[in-house]
Regions:
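Active-site and ligand/interface coordination hotspots across diverse enzymes
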Residues: 1-42
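Divalent-metal-activated hydrolytic enzyme cores
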Residues: 2-6, 12, 21, 85-112, ...
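Short amphipathic alpha-helices and their capping/turn segments at secondary-structure boundaries
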Residues: 11-21, 47-59, 71-73, 109-124
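Short, well-ordered beta-to-alpha junction loops that form the rim of enzyme active sites
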Residues: 31, 128-131, 172
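Short, active-site-adjacent cap segments at secondary-structure transitions
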Residues: 34, 70, 132-135
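Short, surface-exposed acidic-centric catalytic microdomains
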Residues: 44-94
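Short low-complexity, flexible loop/linker segments enriched in glycine and/or proline
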Residues: 77-78, 141-142, 182-186
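Short Gly/Thr/Asp-enriched flexible loops that form oxyanion-binding sites at enzyme active sites
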Residues: 130, 134-157
Length: 217
């Protein structure tokens, strides 16, 4: 197959060598597989993620970095002064809507997810976009009620990327479907599907730069 460039660092030729004895090891944000680990105690189940996780040639793992250190339910958090990589370098913070600084807890949760990936030999992570921890394309910046977004990863996604684990968002529908089709010949991808960076909202919102200057949707 012609290897796409997304997600960065993923070895698409690996799919040609996957077997039941040597499955593709994929780490998921727990909420995408139906686990009630969202900040308000809910799940954000993504059918394509569930289908991928259930394939015989996939060994699925799941983890919620925020649940690991802050529990569930918990106050909503958001990033200030940058995205996840900026948090890891000490230039940005993560605050709850209550005003409490939980940067340390979010970083510890990200490190715990990295350790889970290491133990499980994760070759790919499928994560919840926009999340301050698991986002890969887009995360909030500033107070959530302002609905402002920035390009960049969340803290856990950035931590995994730095550890060499490629990250795919649940909104990357074209790539998810291509991945499933490569592992399941009964699956037919939707030719009209596209990844999140090709969504009209994404292209319009970030047309002027990496931080949106108008209210999001």
């Amino acid at each position: 197959m012609t290897a796409p460039s997304h997600p960065s660092g993923f070895d698409w030729s690996r799919l040609e060598r996957v077997t039941a004895d040597d499955p593709l090891r994929v780490l998921f944000s727990a909420c995408l597989l139906g686990h009630a680990t969202g900040w308000e105690g809910g799940a954000y189940t993504e059918p394509l993620a569930v289908r991928l996780a259930g394939l015989p040639l996939v060994r699925a793992m799941y983890f919620c970095p925020e649940n690991a250190t802050l529990g569930t339910p918990r106050p909503l958090t958001t990033l200030y002064d940058g995205h996840g990589r900026d948090v890891l370098s000490g230039r940005a913070r993560v605050l709850e809507t209550t005003g409490r600084d939980v940067t340390r807890e979010i970083v510890r949760g990200a490190e715990a997810m990295r350790e889970a990936a290491r133990r499980g030999g994760a070759e790919l992570a499928v994560m919840l976009d926009v999340s301050d921890s698991c986002g890969s394309h887009v995360v909030y910046i500033g107070a959530p009620e302002e609905h402002r977004y920035q390009q960049g990863p969340g803290v856990a996604a950035a931590t995994l990327m730095e550890a060499g684990v490629p990250v795919l968002a649940q909104r990357d529908l074209a790539t998810l479907q291509r991945l499933i089709a490569a592992l399941d010949p009964t699956f037919t991808p939707d030719p009209a599907a596209f990844d999140f960076v090709d969504h009209p909202w994404y292209r319009d919102y970030f047309a002027d730069g990496p931080v949106g200057i108008k209210l999001g949707e």
